[in-house]
């Protein structure tokens, strides 16, 4: 027989195999929405097909081993392409991937397949993954968050309001004893949580074990004084998985309620390992998104944060940082609330105005509390309460520790402001229009809040948003 029978070597157009506009998507498919900017002269169908091919079964040439498998069963398919309104030479390409292409319960494998290779592709000037639809069948292979929102409230015995946190500053340079002292002052003043900064791991000036011990002491002392359950996010992120687990185990032995992980720098494999340990041992897990802007900041290349947020809900975490919205543009507010809902809710309808490309059903996977953190202070409290609602964590670092009288009064000011906003909202007042008045009224009864109002009355962070539709 001749070698050429049934197999023709050579390079052929991707779109012949991988562009299938009449494909009906299956309930079990993983669906992706990519924003493509093709190179000049590359038609969008060919670019979309190339993305589908290179992120699934394809390679740059036909190979004889293609005959040993059923490509129709395993190939990714570009099933729809639409131009992006208001942008020149940008398209949204929708790609469907058969479920069989992915390992169960592995966010790592999902990302390696979908975004591992194709972003360096020459036919594309730029590529951004805007959204993923995770099918129910795949969601069910993940444990998800160790505990979720309801279980966390039950553990903490705190209901009907957002939770309050604070990142301990200066983030690097304090000794363990002084660090613990700062934690104690914040918790005593009325915060629910304090937080290790994301880059506090185990450095020469403060080794992790010493920090854990002094923070545990601070937690127990503050709990005894206030009669409330307190926590400090002990950062277990480390250079190896084994070291990370050692830190998590020690936190459990100390009896503290919560640990922390940097999920992008630490990696999804490490994060999922830690999340499983946390569920098995009753630890809450706070997730910081350090490095996210490297991936999600460019509008035309990388990955939108909503994809990283979905991935975190699958991998596991009880809190995740999600931006603040405050003082930014309206468009960004809708987009942020879109992925905040993806983190918290069980079922989210497709809504392009909020950046949600697909309807997502989480089939009772526990929810994640969004954390608003970064440049916020007491004057932002009404807006934050209105935007994020009860199921959130509001974190004021400088907005607590920058109080002229110290940490504990700074914590008091934030707690009073929060309780005032929640009470006003429950009485039916409009936080958006009456916010400043509500804070001013409350400050008459709280000298700590009055001092905070005075010091931060003029501070704003006004820059145009990067992230528009």
From Swiss-Prot:
Pfam families: RuBisCO_large (PF00016), RuBisCO_large_N (PF02788). The disulfide bond which can form in the large chain dimeric partners within the hexadecamer appears to be associated with oxidative stress and protein turnover. GO terms for molecular function: magnesium ion binding; monooxygenase activity; ribulose-bisphosphate carboxylase activity. The active site is at 169 (proton acceptor), 288 (proton acceptor). Its EC number is 4.1.1.39. It is an enzyme of class 4 (lyase). It comes from the Eukaryota. InterPro entries: RuBisCO (IPR033966), RuBisCo_large_chain_AS (IPR020878), RuBisCO_lsu_C (IPR000685), RuBisCO_lsu_C_sf (IPR036376), RuBisCO_lsu_fd_N (IPR017443), RuBisCO_lsu_N_sf (IPR036422), RuBisCO_lsuI (IPR020888). The record marks 328 as: Transition state stabilizer. GO terms for cellular component: chloroplast. The modification N6-carboxylysine is found at residue 195. Its cofactor is Mg(2+). It is found in: Plastid, Chloroplast. GO terms for biological process: photorespiration; reductive pentose-phosphate cycle. SUPFAM superfamilies: RuBisCo, C-terminal domain, RuBisCO, large subunit, small (N-terminal) domain. Substrate binds at residues 117, 167, 171, 289, 321, 373. The basic functional RuBisCO is composed of a large chain homodimer in a 'head-to-tail' conformation. In form I RuBisCO this homodimer is arranged in a barrel-like tetramer with the small subunits forming a tetrameric 'cap' on each end of the 'barrel'. PANTHER family: RIBULOSE BISPHOSPHATE CARBOXYLASE, RIBULOSE BISPHOSPHATE CARBOXYLASE LARGE CHAIN. Belongs to the RuBisCO large chain family. Type I subfamily. Heterohexadecamer of 8 large chains and 8 small chains; disulfide-linked. The disulfide link is formed within the large subunit homodimers. This is Ribulose bisphosphate carboxylase large chain.
């Amino acid at each position: 027989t001749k070698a050429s029978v049934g197999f023709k070597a050579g390079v052929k157009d991707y779109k012949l195999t991988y562009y299938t506009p009449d494909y009906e998507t299956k309930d079990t498919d993983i669906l992706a929405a990519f924003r493509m900017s093709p190179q000049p002269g590359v038609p969008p169908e060919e670019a979309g097909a190339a993305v589908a091919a290179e992120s699934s079964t394809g390679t740059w040439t036909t190979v004889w081993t293609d005959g040993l498998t059923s490509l129709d069963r395993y190939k990714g398919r570009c099933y729809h392409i639409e131009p992006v309104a208001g942008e020149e030479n940008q398209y949204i390409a929708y790609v469907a991937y058969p479920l069989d292409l992915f390992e169960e319960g592995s966010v790592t494998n999902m990302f390696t397949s979908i975004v591992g290779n194709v972003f360096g592709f020459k036919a594309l000037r730029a590529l951004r993954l805007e959204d993923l639809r995770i099918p129910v069948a795949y969601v069910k292979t993940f444990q998800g968050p160790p505990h979720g929102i309801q279980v966390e409230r039950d553990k903490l015995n705190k209901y009907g309001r957002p939770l309050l946190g604070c990142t301990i500053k200066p983030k690097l340079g304090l000794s363990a004893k002084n660090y613990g002292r700062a934690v104690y002052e914040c918790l005593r003043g009325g915060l629910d949580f304090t937080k290790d900064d994301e880059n506090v791991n185990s450095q020469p000036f403060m080794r992790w074990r010493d920090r854990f011990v002094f923070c545990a002491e601070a937690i127990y002392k503050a709990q005894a004084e206030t009669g409330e359950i307190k926590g400090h996010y002990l950062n277990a992120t480390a250079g190896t998985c084994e070291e990370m687990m050692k830190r998590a185990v020690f936190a459990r032995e100390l009896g503290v309620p919560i640990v922390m992980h940097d999920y992008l720098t630490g990696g999804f494999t490490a994060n999922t390992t830690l999340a499983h340990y946390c569920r098995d041992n009753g630890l809450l897990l706070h997730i910081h998104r350090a490095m996210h802007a490297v991936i999600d900041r460019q509008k035309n290349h990388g990955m939108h944060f909503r994809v990283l947020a979905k991935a975190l809900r699958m991998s596991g975490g009880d809190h995740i940082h999600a931006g603040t919205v405050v003082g930014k543009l309206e468009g960004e507010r809708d987009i942020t609330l879109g992925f905040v809902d993806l983190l918290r809710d069980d079922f989210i309808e497709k809504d392009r105005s909020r950046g949600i490309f697909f309807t997502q059903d989480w089939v009772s996977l526990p929810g994640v509390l969004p954390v608003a953190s970064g440049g916020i202070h007491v004057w932002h409290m009404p807006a934050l309460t209105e935007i994020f609602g009860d199921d959130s964590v509001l974190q004021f670092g400088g907005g607590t520790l920058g109080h002229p009288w110290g940490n504990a009064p700074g914590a008091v000011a934030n707690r009073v402001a929060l309780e005032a906003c929640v009470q006003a909202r429950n009485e039916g007042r409009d936080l958006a229009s009456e916010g400043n008045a509500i804070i001013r009224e409350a400050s008459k009864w709280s000298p700590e809040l009055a001092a905070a109002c005075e010091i931060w009355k003029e501070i704003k962070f006004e820059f145009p948003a990067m992230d528009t539709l």
